[in-house]
Amino acid sequence: MDRCTSSFLLLTLVSTLSILQISFAQLVPAIMTFGDSVVDVGNNNYLPTLFRADYPPYGRDFANHKATGRFCNGKLATDITAETLGFTKYPPAYLSPEASGKNLLIGANFASAASGYDDKAALLNHAIPLYQQVEYFKEYKSKLIKIAGSKKADSIIKGAICLLSAGSSDFVQNYYVNPLLYKVYTVDAYGSFLIDNFSTFIKQVYAVGARKIGVTSLPPTGCLPAARTLFGFHEKGCVSRLNTDAQNFNKKLNAAASKLQKQYSDLKIVVFDIYSPLYDLVQNPSKSGFTEATKGCCGTGTVETTSLLCNPKSFGTCSNATQYVFWDSVHPSEAANEILATALIGQGFSLLG
């Protein structure tokens, strides 16, 4: 799917609802976001962690060329999704000063770069572990009740879409680089451990009142530029064993989601397949108007992420990120996020009713 087709599909979705005189904003009163760097909009700016993106060249193509803490040159897939759903403002990062008063009526973002399903890894990285993100969600609900009243707050949370992006950091930044974990878990057993934590998370946010939940699958982790550099050795193309691990994890994730769906009759849960559209972009970049899919735009594009390597002094940063599938060695560019957002919207219609 090229970028023109992607934009046309997004426009068609909005136009169809306009014809039907249905407002996405009415159907989706708020968006709550949990997880990792793929969806963090600035919470890590307020933490003593290396995993931050509140400095150039991050954000150079965002509004006012501002580095907000998003791990991207511009908009995240969730930003584009929010716009498509009729939001004129993005739900604020929960730790930011903007997360107060009426701004909370449209939701909040609790995500934290370097977080994931493995809370111990998140704590080591000085990120917000998933259990703490749930605690912030509970705190958010208390604030919302004070602003809108108990009945309205319950309605907002029940009607909100809750998005979760997690798992990539657990494998790429934790399991694959931590010999101690090898002694405790096989990759399959570690995946099962993460799935147990996923199920716990769903039950916890359900208890707070969430009823519409979308969780992203693992991407083709073996195709991330950093993974090629660190784990590819002499293998050409994507690292096949990492992609196989991701596919096996995704099968477990879908099975767990189906089980939870049966367990809670009023729960709507969708597993967004991010693997397929991103894999297609990497394998056939020119089909979608890209010229580079093996490395990121920032610096050499092979290992750069966070301030350690992707910063204003990074040598070799590209001038036009729209030609790159990846912005840094881990995260997609805004141009790629536009295509991923189309996949999110297309797969998530059941959450809008």
From Swiss-Prot:
GO terms for molecular function: hydrolase activity, acting on ester bonds. Its EC number is 3.1.1.-. The active site is at S37 (nucleophile), D328, H331. One of its GO terms (biological process) is lipid catabolic process. It is an enzyme of class 3 (hydrolase). Glycans are attached at N197, N320. SUPFAM superfamilies: SGNH hydrolase. Belongs to the 'GDSL' lipolytic enzyme family. This is GDSL esterase/lipase APG. One of its GO terms (cellular component) is apoplast. Residues 1-25 form the signal peptide. Its main location: secreted. It is found in: Secreted. Keywords: Glycoprotein, Hydrolase, Lipid degradation, Lipid metabolism, Secreted, Signal.
